[in-house]
């Protein structure tokens, strides 16, 4: 690709702003700041043990999960990058119990930013791809945010994206007008458009699920996975392969590129907890991206983006990816209702 012909993230967003007239300047600037923060996170991740940021921090987040040093650092990078720009009313993060209002000494904007600063952090110390997930909403109360301001269904998202820190660092984005992927050119520090209008194949022969939990699954999930595992001898009449990275951004990025279905269901171990993944900053942004790429995303019983949130850290079951497979496993759940 000729350097002169490259489309950077900034150029892409400005062109989108001109062509669609539905990408406000403040939203464009906010996306650029998030992308810049992801570059800083990528740099710290890539240093590994040389940066003395591996290992646990000796603390837990609001979910009771042990925090890694890079979890905390990534959270601080996103907060520091976004608090002063005047585009946001408030932020919320997996790593914080309550929301983060923009300090009074900085101007406030009309948007809310919600993020998982470092998804898949159990993989940090073993050099497996991890990432950042984010979602942008409008603040319904103008520039004065409360926790209730964040509790909007995913259909109200105005932008969502993720970064993957792997062999390449990529930034995947939707503003409701398709899905595009940008690759970080480390030599010049720019995000360069490398995939346009990404589309998930409707059919697939790959699935992603943590099979070690099989004994705890409810019947619809067991039925679906058993059919896949039966291969050509089973009711599907075809062989399927399982892929599981234990990093949602990595699994979803693979599905976005070559199809597949990602499943993180509720199970019998914790019947009072509907799933593990968080709605606001994991399931909703990924569902927005997947749907914009022609896929589907459900809880097994309803479209994820139509779930009305009741809390910042609410959890939901997740089934997303190639539409025909998501429709099938969703149908099995609906039969049991």
From Swiss-Prot:
Oligomeric state and interaction partners are given as: Homotetramer.
| UniProt KW keywords | Carbohydrate metabolism, Cytoplasm, Hydrolase, Magnesium, Metal-binding
Residues that coordinate or bind substrate: 119-122, 210, 276
Q: Which family does it belong to?
A: Belongs to the FBPase class 1 family.
Binding, Mg(2+) 2 = 116, 119, 282
Report the protein name in the record: Fructose-1,6-bisphosphatase class 1
What pathway does this protein act in? Carbohydrate biosynthesis; gluconeogenesis
Q: Which GO terms describe its cellular component?
A: cytosol
Cited HAMAP family: FBPase_class1
Enzyme Commission number, as recorded? 3.1.3.11
GO BP terms in the entry: fructose 1,6-bisphosphate metabolic process; fructose 6-phosphate metabolic process; fructose metabolic process; gluconeogenesis; sucrose biosynthetic process
Bound how, and how many: what does the cofactor note say? Binds 2 magnesium ions per subunit.
MF terms from GO for this chain are: fructose 1,6-bisphosphate 1-phosphatase activity; magnesium ion binding
Residues that bind Mg(2+) 1:
94, 116, 118
What Pfam families is this protein classified in? FBPase, FBPase_C
Q: Localized where?
A: Cytoplasm
The protein's required cofactors? Mg(2+)
Task: Give the matching InterPro entries.
Answer: FBPase_C_dom (IPR044015), FBPase_class-1 (IPR000146), FBPase_N (IPR033391), FBPtase (IPR028343)
């Amino acid at each position: 690709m000729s350097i002169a012909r490259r489309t950077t993230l900034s150029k892409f967003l400005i062109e989108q702003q001109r062509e669609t007239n539905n990408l406000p300047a403040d939203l464009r600037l906010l996306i650029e700041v998030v992308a810049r923060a992801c570059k800083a996170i990528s740099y710290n991740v890539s240093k590994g043990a040389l940066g003395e940021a591996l290992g646990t921090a000796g603390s837990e987040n609001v979910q009771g999960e042990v925090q890694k040093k890079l979890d905390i650092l990534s959270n601080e990078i996103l907060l520091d990058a976004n608090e002063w720009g005047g585009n946001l009313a408030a932020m919320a993060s997996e790593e914080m119990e309550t929301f983060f209002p923009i300090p009074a000494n900085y101007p406030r904007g009309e948007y809310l930013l919600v993020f998982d600063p470092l998804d898949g952090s159990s993989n940090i110390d073993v050099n497996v791809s991890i990432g950042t997930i984010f979602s942008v909403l409008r603040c319904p109360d103008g520039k004065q945010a409360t926790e209730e301001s964040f509790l909007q269904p995913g259909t109200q998202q105005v932008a969502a994206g993720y970064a993957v820190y792997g062999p390449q660092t990529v930034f995947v984005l939707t503003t409701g007008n398709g899905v595009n992927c940008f690759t970080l050119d480390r030599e010049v520090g720019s995000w360069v458009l490398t995939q346009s209008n990404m589309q998930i194949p409707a059919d697939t022969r790959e699935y992603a699920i943590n099979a070690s939990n099989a004994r705890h699954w409810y019947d619809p999930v067991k039925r679906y996975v058993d059919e896949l595992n039966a291969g050509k001898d089973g009711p599907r009449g075809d062989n399927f392969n399982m892929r599981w990275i234990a990093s949602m951004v990595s699994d979803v990025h693979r599905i976005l590129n070559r199809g597949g279905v990602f499943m993180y269901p509720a199970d019998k171990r914790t019947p009072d907890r509907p799933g593990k993944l968080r709605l606001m900053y994991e399931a909703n942004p990924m569902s927005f991206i997947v749907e914009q790429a022609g896929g589907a995303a459900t809880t097994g019983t309803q479209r994820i983006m139509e779930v009305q949130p009741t809390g910042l850290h609410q959890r939901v079951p997740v089934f997303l990816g190639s539409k025909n497979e998501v429709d099938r496993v969703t149908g099995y759940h609906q039969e049991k209702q």
